[in-house]
């Protein structure tokens, strides 16, 4: 199954869904999203061997919250949604959509917000980014979108991505339409922007028991059934790994067919789990999966592969 976004003016003629149909997409709800992420990162930093880095990530998430409200985005995406729907493409496709200079404005605002909190190497990194030309910043953004991670140092990537993510999340929250599930493939990528997931979550509330993958760029969540590989869609050789026990709130779902894994967070086990924060705080599980010979099918926005990885 694939997911397509239907323009607002086409909803009535396609609206044959029943009231209890599974929502294929959950667009980002930006109110307090970054504050909640920052709080969770700080909470997880306690007694965690990666505590310092989690607190560093919390600073970036908090800065995103501040910049979000200082620089709201106004954009009419109606024409873009119609065009993308006709082409069967994600409306905010990272490989097609021209980038507005708004994202660089967000980056410089993030830097200004973070500078008083940074010191040492981290301060040097953002000062270097502050001096970079528009062309250099665009080249780094393009490299990240093309998964050419060797071209962007791993210490610069989180700052660049934080600005890009804020921009894409703002756009995603403005999409005037709804989603419809259709037959097709490639549900391993975000139906809104085409980026990768960071993790998946089995939710509570109105979507109780359903699994949604969380986009590492635009913050959209999309439904993928449980007990099925989110990367290759096979289900015959899946295994579940945890560091604690059967009731762990974080597990890794591995697939013997494609050799990858994706973490699953369970809100019913811990209602406070957060897609980005809990993924970053559980890198010990990633190390275990690497030892078992599996590769991540996701990328955390605060931890990009370095050269040679």
Curated annotation (Swiss-Prot):
SUPFAM superfamilies: FdhE-like. One of its GO terms (molecular function) is ferric iron binding. Keywords: Cytoplasm. It holds the Pfam family FdhE_C. Signal peptide: none annotated. One of its GO terms (cellular component) is cytosol. The keyword Cytoplasm applies. Its main location: cytoplasm. GO terms for biological process: protein maturation. It is found in: Cytoplasm. Necessary for formate dehydrogenase activity. Belongs to the FdhE family. This is Protein FdhE homolog. It comes from Citrobacter koseri (strain ATCC BAA-895 / CDC 4225-83 / SGSC4696).
């Amino acid at each position: 199954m694939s997911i397509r976004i239907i323009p607002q003016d086409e909803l009535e003629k396609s609206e044959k869904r029943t009231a209890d149909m599974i929502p294929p997409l959950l667009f980002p709800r930006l109110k307090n999203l970054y504050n909640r992420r920052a709080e969770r990162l700080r909470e997880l930093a306690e007694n965690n061997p990666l505590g310092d880095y989690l607190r560093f990530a919390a600073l970036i998430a908090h800065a995103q919250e501040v910049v979000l409200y200082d620089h709201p985005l106004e954009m009419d995406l109606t024409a873009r949604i119609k065009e993308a729907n006709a082409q069967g493409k994600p409306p905010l496709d990272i490989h097609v959509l021209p980038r507005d200079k708004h994202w660089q404005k967000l980056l410089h605002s993030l830097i200004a917000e973070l500078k008083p909190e940074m010191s040492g190497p981290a301060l040097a990194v953002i000062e270097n980014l502050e001096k970079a030309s528009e062309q250099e910043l665009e080249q780094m953004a393009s490299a990240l979108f093309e998964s050419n991670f060797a071209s962007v140092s791993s210490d610069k990537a989180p700052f660049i991505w934080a600005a890009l993510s804020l921009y894409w999340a703002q756009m995603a929250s403005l999409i005037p339409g709804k989603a419809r599930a259709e037959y097709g493939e490639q549900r391993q990528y975000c139906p809104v922007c085409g980026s990768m997931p960071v993790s998946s979550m089995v939710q509570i509330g109105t979507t109780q028991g359903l699994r949604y993958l969380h986009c590492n760029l635009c913050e959209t969540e999309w439904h993928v059934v449980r007990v099925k590989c989110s990367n290759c869609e096979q289900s015959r050789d899946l295994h579940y790994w945890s560091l604690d026990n059967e009731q762990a709130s974080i597990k890794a779902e591995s697939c013997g067919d494609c050799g990858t894994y994706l973490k699953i967070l369970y809100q019913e086990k811990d209602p406070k789990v957060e897609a980005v924060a809990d993924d970053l705080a559980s890198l010990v599980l990633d190390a275990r999966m690497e030892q078992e010979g599996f590769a991540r099918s996701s990328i955390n926005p605060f931890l990009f592969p370095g050269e040679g990885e």
